[in-house]
């Protein structure tokens, strides 16, 4: 399976640096990295151009696309280039050391296309490091999406809710039998406390600071229990 990553980058170089450091520590193999950078920060673009641990295709947008369209266009470029799976990530979401191992396990799971996608973030983490289960929840804090899922679920529904693409996918889950695959213990964590689009620092702290996520360097033996 040909695998790509799709990262969006805006104007917070300090967060982007943390995200890329965490990504490198997952030891991703056989991924090509697609980046959609908004044309607003020379420091962010410099960081993107300096990436040397994965093959990287950088697109500097001709105008600011925003939090809905930049992820869509970046993922679309990866699928249009022929990749079978795209791992989506934003510039203020850090990863657990075994996050790439989880994505690889998802790629090998023979029933993966029965689900909307793999959601690496779990706001209700309960501590089991190995279990991956079916959930009706959805968030955009790192996803893995196959070509089949992209064509069947994301393309027809991504722009259906004006509030945002996460609301579009939440609505799809609510009105259908579909579920997500998600780890019992979150494999991503939101660090975008300041300078973002959606949250004030106090809102961010309330929603994210105390949510458990896997931080030790052990690699789990993932067990899919949908």
Task: Describe the residue ranges of each PLM region.
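Peripheral/terminal regions associated with large enzymatic or DNA-binding modules
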Residues: 1-89, 93-226
């Amino acid at each position: 399976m040909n695998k790509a990553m799709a990262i969006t980058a805006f104007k917070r170089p300090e967060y982007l640096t943390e995200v890329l450091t965490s990504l490198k520590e997952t030891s991703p193999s056989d991924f090509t990295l697609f980046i959609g950078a908004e044309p607003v920060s020379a420091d962010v673009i410099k960081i993107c151009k300096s990436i040397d641990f994965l093959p990287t295709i950088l697109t500097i947008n001709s105008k600011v696309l925003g939090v809905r369209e930049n992820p869509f266009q970046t993922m679309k470029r990866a699928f249009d280039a022929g990749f079978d799976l795209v791992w989506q990530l934003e510039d203020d979401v850090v990863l657990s050391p075994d996050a790439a191992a989880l994505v690889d396990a998802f790629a090998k799971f023979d029933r993966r296309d029965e689900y909307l996608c793999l959601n690496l973030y779990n706001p209700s983490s309960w501590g089991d490091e190995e279990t991956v289960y079916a959930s009706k929840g959805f968030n955009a804090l790192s996803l893995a999406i196959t070509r089949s899922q992209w064509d069947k679920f994301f393309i027809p529904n991504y722009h259906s809710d004006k509030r945002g693409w996460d609301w579009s996918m939440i609505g799809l889950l609510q009105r259908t039998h579909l579920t997500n695959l998600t780890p019992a213990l979150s494999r991503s964590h939101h660090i975008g406390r300041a300078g973002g689009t959606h949250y004030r620092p106090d809102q961010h702290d309330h929603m994210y600071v105390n949510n458990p996520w896997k931080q030790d360097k052990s690699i789990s033996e993932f067990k899919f229990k949908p």
